[in-house]
C-alpha cells in the first residue's frame, strides 16, 4: 500500500521533468509567424501560452474559444485534425512579443505542453540559421554544376528524422520589391507578408508532410530572392570598383571623383608658369630697346666725328671763298678751251712760263680774256657764273655751282665776246 502511495506521489514530478522539444525563431519587427504544434489527442482544448516571469505560470494567449486582449486581431488558431496538428499564426510582431511560448492540449496550461517556442523580435534580421546554401541569383550553369557535383548542399531540404523541425523565412521589406522573372518551370507565387513557421513532429511522421515542406521552402526562396539579389548586385559592383581602381578609390565612394589635393597644387603651378613667361617677354623687350638705343647713339657719335675731321681751317675757307671759278665748268653747257701761250699778252706770258717748282702759297686761277673773234652761235640752256657764291659754314665741302636759267641776270665781265644763247 505504501508503495502505491509513493508511486502516485512521484508521478506528477516525473511528468514535470519531461523535456519538451524546443524551437528558436528570430523575427523582424512587424513580421508574422506561423507555429505548427503537434496534436496528440483529438477533440480536446488546444492552446498557446506565454511563460511569465514567475516559474510554473503560463498565461494563455489563444485557445479554441479565447483570445487574449493584447493579441486580438493578431493571433489566430486553426486546427488541422487530419494532420494531427494545429496552426497558430501571429502577425504584426513587436519587441514586446519577445519571450518563451508553449503550445499544448488540455484544460490547464501547466500540464499537457507539447512544444516550447523561443521568439526573438528585432529590427535587423540576421542570416537564417537553418539555411546552408547561399540563395542569391547564380548562373544556370553554376546551379547545374552544384547539383551534379555537390548533392550534399541540397540535403538540408529534406526533413530530418529528429523530433523537431523549424522553418523560418526572411521578413517582408518595407518597400515593395520589383517583380523578378522566374523560369517557366517554377510556378509564380503571389507575394504575401513574410511568414515564419515552426512545427514539431515525431519520428514516425507521415510522408504526406514532405511535399508541403518542400513547397514552403521553394516559396520562401522565391520570396527572399529579390532582397538578396539586390544585396549581391551592390556587393559585386563594390568589389569591381575596388579591384579596378585600387586602394585609393575610396575617395570616389564619398563623391570626390577628382583628387582635390593634387588639383589645388596644379592651379598655383600653372599660374606661376604663366607669370614667368610674361616676365621673360617683358625683360626681353626691354633688353632689345636698350640695345637699339645704344646702337643709335653710336651711329650719331660716328657721324659727328667724321664731320669734325673733314672740316677745313678758316683761312683756307676764306681763300677758297675768294678764288675765282674756272670757265671749265662741268655743269656748263658751253665749255671754253684754254688758249695757247702765243695768244696771251706780254704781261701774262711770264706767269705762264714760270717754273713749276715755285710754291703755290696762294693758288690763283687766271681767266683768259675773251678773244676778239666773232661770237659763235651756240645753243645753250644755262650759263655759269664766274664767281662762287658764299657757302654756308655748316657745309664746307660744297663746291657746287649755282646756275641761273636767265642770262639777263649775269654780271658784267671784262670786254670780250659772250656766248649768245637763243
From Swiss-Prot:
Q: Which GO terms describe its molecular function?
A: high-affinity IgM receptor activity; IgM binding; polymeric immunoglobulin binding
Q: Which InterPro entries match?
A: CD300_family_receptors, Ig-like_dom_sf, Ig-like_fold, Ig_V-set
Q: Where is the composition biased (Low complexity)?
A: 344-363
| Tissue-level expression | Expressed in pre-B cells, immature and mature B cells residing in primary and secondary lymphoid organs (at protein level). In the spleen, highly expressed in follicular and marginal zone B cells and at lower levels in germinal center B cells and plasma cells. Expressed in splenic dendritic cells and in granulocytes. In the peritoneum, expressed in B1-a and B-2 cell lineages. In the bone marrow, expressed in immature B cells and at a lower level in pro- and pre-B cells (at protein level). Expressed in M cells (at protein level).
User: Which intervals of the chain are annotated as region Disordered?
Assistant: 290-367, 391-422
- The chain's Extracellular topological domains, given as residue ranges, are 18-262
Subcellular location as annotated: Cell membrane; Early endosome membrane; Golgi apparatus, trans-Golgi network membrane; Lysosome membrane
Which Cys residues form disulphide pairs? 37-103, 49-58
Q: How does it assemble?
A: Interacts (via Ig-like domain) with IGHM (via CH4/Cmu4 domain), both secreted and membrane-bound IgM; the interaction is glycan-independent and multivalent theoretically involving up to eight binding sites for the IgM pentamer.
Q: What does this protein do?
A: High-affinity Fc receptor for immunoglobulin M (IgM), both secreted and membrane-bound IgM. Primarily regulates IgM transport and homeostasis. In lymphoid cells, enables exocytosis of membrane-bound IgM on the plasma membrane as well as endocytosis of IgM-antigen complexes toward lysosomes for degradation. In mucosal epithelium, mediates retrotranscytosis of antigen-IgM complexes across mucosal M cells toward antigen-presenting cells in mucosal lymphoid tissues.
What is the name listed in the Swiss-Prot or TrEMBL entry for this protein? Immunoglobulin mu Fc receptor
Which species is the source of this protein?
A: Mus musculus
Q: What is the lineage of its organism?
A: Eukaryota, Metazoa, Chordata, Craniata, Vertebrata
What gene is behind this protein? Fcmr
